[in-house]
Amino acid sequence: MKRTIVILGLLTAVVTAASSVNAEPLIWGVQVEQLENRFTGDAQSDVMAWDGDALIGTDELKFVVRSEGEFQTRSDRLETMETQLRLQKPISTFFDAVAGVRFDTPDGRDRVHGVLGVHGLAPQWFEVDADLFVSDRPSARFEVEYEALITNYLTLTPSIELDVPLRDNNDAEVAAWGPKLEVGARLSYDLVDRSVAPYVGVHYERVFGDTLDLREAEGEEGDGLFFVAGLRLMF
């Protein structure tokens, strides 16, 4: 109950801060950064993954729904899914403050988290997301992505993501300060005016520290290399 009150308080604070802004044209959009199949030499480990946003609002305040997850294609099972409801308000020319709530699926303990963070463009046009997830088992996440234009139609997008649990969570097989690192590179072809872009690439992930020990104790690998094929969509 206390956690819910805190989350609602954060959202209310952001809305109140924007209440004095004059009416502006409404903007909206959908951007799916990743909609892909990830392949390994073992079909049991192949997954379908997605990561996308939908937003509506103005330049001064945006409401964003973010979804990402993985689905085991071989076993026909949802492995993880994360849904965030976020409010974003500019704090500088290139960065927004973020406040919201995150829901994890499948159901389990501590599946609701408050979200505090920043989102924007760093120098040299690196897209940055830095979020703190507040709950009984808090964690932090840092993401960086860069779009390198090779030709008018070909774009190489390297990315890196670091998840750091701040407390043990045996249900999720993560240990405090045992981070998970994900690194990828995707080469896309602009098929329809940046709205549809098929891509291929590689994706590597690895866990460290006590999280690695937990995985190995369950007979699981601590890392994985995937070849990926998918679509980027923007409307």
Segments from the language model and where they lie:
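Outer-membrane beta-barrel "beta-signal"
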Residues: 185-191, 222-235
